[in-house]
Amino acid sequence: MIYRRLGRTDLNVSLLSLGTGGARRFGQATDMTLIDQQALLHHAIDLGVNLIDTAEQYGESESILGRCLRGIPRNQYFLSTKWSPRIGEEFVPDPVALQASVERSLKRLGTDYIDIMFFHGPRVAEYGAVVDQLYPVLDALRNAGKIRSVGLSTPFVYDPAQEVARIALTENPAMWDVVMLKYGILNQHAANHILTLADRYDVGVMNMAAVRIKLPNPVLLEELIR
């Protein structure tokens, strides 16, 4: 396995990570048993994967991970999770809800700290409120030792050019330790500005859903290659 320092953080992460979202949500959609979920997670760790990503919005993924990770030394893996400032389609920048969400995530994951806490997919028009009203909550939690790094993930379905990340790294690069982007064959917008800015300011980059849709499906993969 290849490892890299994730931006300015002190996290030396595996090039490949294990995600628990998408349509399957770590086997929730396919009725995978806890034994099989544990086997999958342990196999990934045995292969050298040490970065595991989840979110409160991924059904029971955090709780499942918490059970699967029992008995594995905490220094063998890094955890990233996310909180969305949305209720349905409504943007609700509630600092109290964010604080409560982090506490719930800690309890479900069975850990004293989260390595990377992301804002989950805020849109361009919402970015200012995230910075002014919500970021101070995560900054305080970082100072308290409950999170180690603060990140921003992009809502690429609503913002294919991922302008929110460009704005974040242009206006407030020192605030963001990590950004999570969608980058691949069919969406290379990040190469225009965002990756250059991330490199300039030593901001870590995580690529979401790198193999989730096309590569596991031979038919879609063949169509993509054609």
Where are these regions (language model features)?
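Conserved, mostly hydrophobic/aromatic
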Residues: L6, L18, A44, I52, ...
